[in-house]
Amino acid sequence: MAITVRPMTLQETALIIEYFHAATPEHLEMLGVDPTRLPLAPQWQRLYEQMFDRPVEQRNGFLVSWLSDDRFLGFSTADKIRIGQQANMHLHITDPSLRKQGIGVECVRKTVELYFQVLELKQLFCEPNAFNVAPNRTLQKAGFTYVKTHMTIPGPLNYHQAVNRWMIDRG
């Protein structure tokens, strides 16, 4: 399976919104997502439109699509971006039948290279829910170094939870 990783288009942001709004309560819990924090779809789409109206270096996020033969496999988002310094990434395989097959490792490796290039990073972090085994294994296999486990709210959709902090440092 040939995997392509590239910056997401504005039209593809609808796939992120659909992914979260269609997810089961169990899946959201595994991700550490509080369903009451999900913006309504039209509001969320407007937020993405506003983001895409700005140059990359002025955005509060950077979105990446994962594809195979033009089929959407999943996505990564970066936030807490400090251009030239650091960012935090998130990772999602959207089709449940494609999970636990090792696809995420290649997607993450290619995404890391894209983030370091476009955002001119020295450090990239990822903080998945400590009890969600899949992304933690994926990050380890993709070359991230485990830093620590701690309690935090990793993003605007999340509740307070235990997360594992992973890092790639090229500073």
List the predicted regions and their residue ranges.
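Acyl-donor (CoA/ACP) binding surface of acyl/acetyltransferases
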Residues: 1-15, 21-26, 65-171
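Intrinsic-disorder/low-complexity coil detector
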Residues: 6, 34, 38-41, 54, ...
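Amphipathic alpha-helical segments used for helix-helix packing
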Residues: 19, 29-33, 62
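Conserved GNAT-fold acetyl-CoA-binding loop/helix
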Residues: 26-50
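A short helix-loop-beta-strand connector motif used in the catalytic cores of GNAT acetyltransferases and
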Residues: 50-64, 74
